[in-house]
Amino acid sequence: MASADEPLVRVDGLQKYFYENDGLLDRLLGQEPTAVKAVDGISFDIKRGETLGLVGESGCGKSTTGETMVRLQEPTNGIVEFEGKNIYDLDGEGLQQFRRECQVVFQDPFSSLDPRLTIGQSIMQPMNVHNIGTKKERLERTKELLEYVGLSAGQVDRYPHEFSGGQRQRIGIARALALEPDFIMLDEPTSALDVSVQAQVLNLLEDLQDEFDLTYLLISHDLSVIKHVCDRVAVMYLGEIVEIGPVDEIFKDPQHPYTRALLESVPRASTEEQGRDRDVITGDVPSPRNPPSGCSFRTRCPSIIQPPGLQMEQDAYREVTEYRTRLETGRISIKSRWDLVGDPDKEDTGAFIESLRDELFTHTFAGENEEIIEESLRCLAEDDTETATALLTDRFASICEQVNPVLQDTAHPSACHLVEQPAHITDQVREWEATRE
């Protein structure tokens, strides 16, 4: 058992990749597997009795992280320690003991219960598997659990379809408590529920945590849920944790641009908030099959760092960055643009440039910046994407795409070049900046 000073759960360098083109036929045809980096080297710990929130947009890897932490998925790399033991080394009795001490509450209360079983049978299933108590003792324990979660012991013989969504989620929570676990992974436990029911379930989880000394990992995309329940928050983007810290600090003083943008997306009721400046996230989420170099958020970041010596309005620089991203990801079709111009013979280069410029930019440019952008558009008109991309990279490349920032060894770290980075990252930044002089 971990000492009082040690975390109950410790995650170190956890990776979970899924591979495409990796079947037998693909191999016979000589195709290379493509890695989808769902979780890409994350590290954090959870203290006993704590609730850690894991928040981010859909598809960022939150649920995969949770599933891998409880061995519903096997990792590609990294370790998860529970009470000081690497869970991926466990088998036999050791693995069975871990299953007892670690439970899950799933997102969808409608599909997480077997419709052919009564709710009593569903709650008793874990006790049956682990051979806990006699049949009579299991039934009594089940009735106690139903009352703990705000239902009636007399409902033990009813079927799931006889209950509302909120009641079904309470049943799922009762099932998770059946083995008296120390740790529960809550995967979006309220997202499928009406707003009026969400607070009831969250309050229940808090009451149960106090009564049974539980430790939670709460996965959610809803920041209001995170703020209501959690002690600390880890913010996840494209398979990586970009910021982690105490919940009050995260909400009052977010350090990472992605965290700030998430918080800005939360509706504000106060009229004093009208007309406030907002960091709006633009662009599409990159594919985990081919994540961006450097900081994974840099293709959408409102605060992306300009190269030394380049003095532009930040919004104008963001437009150039989006133009570069579209070029690099093949999202500018030269043929379609000529068709839109109505010049299939590709003779009116000026019309091509004007059409594309109107779509890409709302700002005007001057001097060398204008010359580079104009020349890159001209190269596109000539179907020379490689030169167009190189011109933009030479002039507008950011440190954010060259050096990947990391989380500092502090209570509130942020993986961003806008906050102080460790010495080895700072050295890489200086080396790159020296090449730009």
Predicted regions located by residue number:
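Conserved ABC transporter NBD signature motif
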Residues: G78-D89
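ABC ATPase NBD coupling module
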Residues: I87-Q103, V129, I250-P254, P286-P292
